[in-house]
Amino acid sequence: MIRIVHRNPLELWGEPSYNERWISISGGIGGPLLIVNDPGLVRHVLVDNARNYKMATVRQNILRPILLDGLLTAEGDVWKRSRKAMAPVFTPRHIFGFAKAMVSATDAFIGRYENARGPVDVARDMTMLTYDILAETLFSGQVAGEPGSFGHEVDRLFETMGRVDPLDILRAPLWMPRLTRIRGRKSLAFFRQIVTDTVKMREARMTAGTDVPEDFLTLLLRAEGPDGLSRAEIEDNIITFIGAGHETTARALGWTIYLLAEASWEREKIEAEIDEVLAREADPVKWLENMPRTRAAFEEAMRLYPPAPSINREPVEDDRYHDLVIKKGTQVLVMPWTLHRHRKLWDAPEAFMPSRFLPENRDTIDRYQYLPFGAGPRVCIGASFAMQEAIIVLALLLKRYRFEKTPGLKPWPVQKLTTQPQGGLPMLVERRQ
């Protein structure tokens, strides 16, 4: 079991996980385990009784060495203060203000497909593109050091540090070295130093009264103070944005493009929608509300391949949900991977059917059976940013290009920090006529 968890935790879940409301395992290697697939119990754990559920030890052992007190890993008063301080940063006004940067970064990137010969790895390309978008919206491209090396170290860091180690499953203390993640330490140190230098560089400009761009970094520095963010917390959250903000959206975009190549009839509808909207609407802020089919395809891709395939919690005190007793210390796994493919919650759960998410059908989906961004107090603060970014990328990309599968392509999903295609997504790209 430990070997499977290290290789790919998604392989653990057998047929009962896709049919039962919950599964309780009392004799697990890492202690008692509860797998949650019931929307009512999801709401109980993540919303109604969220105060009783802390971040699970296994999850913290993986993420905390990288993110420290970023929003994904901070708890208690630190999390409350950080969330309150950052809420104004993620208002619609600021997110809408980043649309033009998203467009320019996407336009600059996708030009590389103009003379593409042979397969391109869409999974890797979407990772690079969303990093470029994040570099523009977070730093306005003003990164200390060599930007190319920064992007490379980001990829290496989350590739090596995001794996589950056997010691994590056994809940070993963090001072015990995880051999599987030693390679990532150099990348982490390099990565943190660049973030520190970039923050200092921007702060010096602000102190000198020099004009600075209205990007995420400037907004975060303005949130610094006794009641806001400390300098260390600003840096931790920048690293969190880079990890959660570009990796998760990139994976969802890659899966969307692959699924549309498999379902050419769906792709044709989306191409027609994109052509019609872009012909009459120049403002990218308006694209999301005017492209319901494109949005539905992206949301359906996140159902089949959720960016975060598991949400791990641990009760602080004994709890009860109807006749289910949840003991203190139990590893509670809210599982978007199985929840999104559950036989009793979805019609044809393995099929790619974007129509599920069209406006006229949304009311049939329980809020707590679909969790691409989580739920409750710790719902993803950047969900609106991610949705805007995804639609802009898909609109500009699919307006100009069409992607086809390479012969025999059947990607195997692997859980690391996100749901990734093992071996990438090699696809053929051609200019649309």
Which sequence ranges carry the predicted segments?
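Cytochrome P450 proximal C-terminal region
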Residues: 17, 106, 110, 126, ...
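Cytochrome P450 I-helix active-site segment
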Residues: 99, 103, 152-156, 208-218, ...
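Cytochrome P450 catalytic-core helices
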Residues: 248-267, 271-273, 384-399
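Conserved cytochrome P450 K-helix/beta-meander segment immediately N-terminal to the heme-binding cysteine loop
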Residues: 334-361
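Cytochrome P450 heme-thiolate monooxygenase catalytic core
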Residues: 54-60, 78, 94-251, 269, ...
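N-terminal membrane-proximal hinge/A-helix region immediately C-terminal to the signal-anchor transmembrane segment
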Residues: 1-81, 96-111, 129, 144-145, ...
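Conserved cytochrome P450 K-helix E-x-x-R motif and the immediately C-terminal K′/meander segment
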Residues: 2-23, 193, 197, 281-322
